[in-house]
């Protein structure tokens, strides 16, 4: 993606760019992809492993073993602050450090609604339909009935309701590509082209990242993959970088794409069942927001 493109060109620029890699051994859930194996090799060798992804790209490199130690960070940054070439500062940290609940359940505490800091319990409970839960139950049933059904996420398994136990239950039929929405859509298109039944779940706000693949890979080829668009609403995420209402103008203008908008659980499940069963179109479903 764009971050890799920037890293690739940084060495050629040769300027005093300091690139900080906060390595807490996790994405939102667990990490996926070949790069993370090399990060582990670097951690295990205290940064001395000869196989070094960053050096292979022409970047200088230093390693900080305890990135939660403020003094160690000060020393590392003091060492590199006036350097005259690009350098990577690889920092080994613990996600949720200092808060027991977050240390014990890193995935849940990546993002939380307001909670009691003493107990970790949410301050507000929602009685509305949980469409992530509904989705997971439906897809697990479908995957058991048909080995061609594959559930795909790009680093956000919780949006589909796939807890660690459910991911384990689904086995190879659940695929997490990491935070790589472009690849997720291209993968879904390829699976559909070869007779599979891919279902890719993604937050509305991340649709823009995959627009090229939606148009070029999926819809031009008219491959019958299913795209579940979550939190397409004005009241969901309200950060300016995570607004969730651009999916309709983005998706609805792509030829061959069928975009559905159910209003209740019954309509949603009927549309999801149909979209998996049919073989004529790529289908997106705007999942009702709770």
Language model features with spans:
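Active-site flanking residues adjacent to catalytic metal/cofactor-binding acidic residues
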Residues: 1, 21-22, 89, 285
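A short alpha/beta connector and helix-capping loop motif
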Residues: 2-21, 102, 197, 221-224
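Short, glycine/polar-rich helix-capping loops at beta-to-alpha or helix-loop-helix junctions
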Residues: 5, 28, 46-51, 159-162, ...
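Alpha-helical scaffold elements adjacent to nucleotide-binding pockets in ATP/GTP-utilizing enzyme cores
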Residues: 5-9, 34, 53, 75-79, ...
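Mobile "lid/hinge" segments at catalytic clefts and subdomain interfaces of large enzymes
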Residues: 11-45, 51-53, 221, 255
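Hydrophobic alpha-helical bundles that form the membrane domains of multi-pass transporters
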Residues: 19, 36, 47, 57-64, ...
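Thiamine diphosphate
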Residues: 59-76, 82-286
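Catalytic alpha/beta core of large soluble enzyme barrels
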Residues: 288-290
């Amino acid at each position: 993606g764009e971050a890799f493109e920037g890293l690739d060109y940084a060495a050629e620029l040769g300027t005093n760019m300091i690139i900080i890699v906060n390595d807490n051994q996790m994405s939102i859930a667990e990490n996926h992809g070949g790069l993370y194996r090399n990060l582990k090799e670097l951690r295990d060798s205290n940064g001395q492993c000869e196989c070094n992804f960053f050096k292979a790209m022409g970047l200088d490199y230093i390693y900080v073993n305890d990135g939660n130690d403020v003094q160690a960070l000060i020393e590392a940054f003091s060492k590199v602050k006036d350097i005259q070439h690009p350098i990577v500062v690889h920092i080994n940290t613990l996600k949720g450090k200092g808060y027991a609940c977050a240390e014990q359940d890193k995935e849940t505490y990546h993002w939380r609604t307001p909670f009691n800091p003493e107990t970790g319990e949410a301050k507000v409970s929602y009685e509305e339909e949980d469409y992530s839960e509904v989705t997971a139950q439906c897809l697990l049933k479908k995957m058991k009935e048909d080995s061609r059904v594959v559930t795909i996420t790009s680093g956000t398994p919780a949006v589909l309701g796939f807890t660690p136990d459910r991911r384990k239950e689904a086995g190879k039929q659940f695929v997490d590509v990491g935070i790589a929405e472009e690849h997720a859509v291209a993968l879904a298109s390829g699976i559909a082209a070869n007779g599979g039944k891919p279902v890719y779940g993604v937050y509305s706000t991340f649709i823009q990242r995959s627009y090229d693949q939606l148009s070029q890979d999926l819809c031009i080829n008219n491959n019958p993959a299913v795209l579940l668009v979550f939190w397409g609403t004005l009241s969901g995420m309200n950060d300016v970088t995570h607004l969730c209402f651009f999916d309709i103008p983005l998706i609805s203008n792509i030829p061959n794409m069928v975009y559905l908008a159910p209003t209740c659980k019954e309509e949603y499940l009927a549309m999801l069942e149909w979209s998996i069963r049919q073989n004529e179109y790529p289908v997106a479903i705007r999942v009702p927001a709770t």
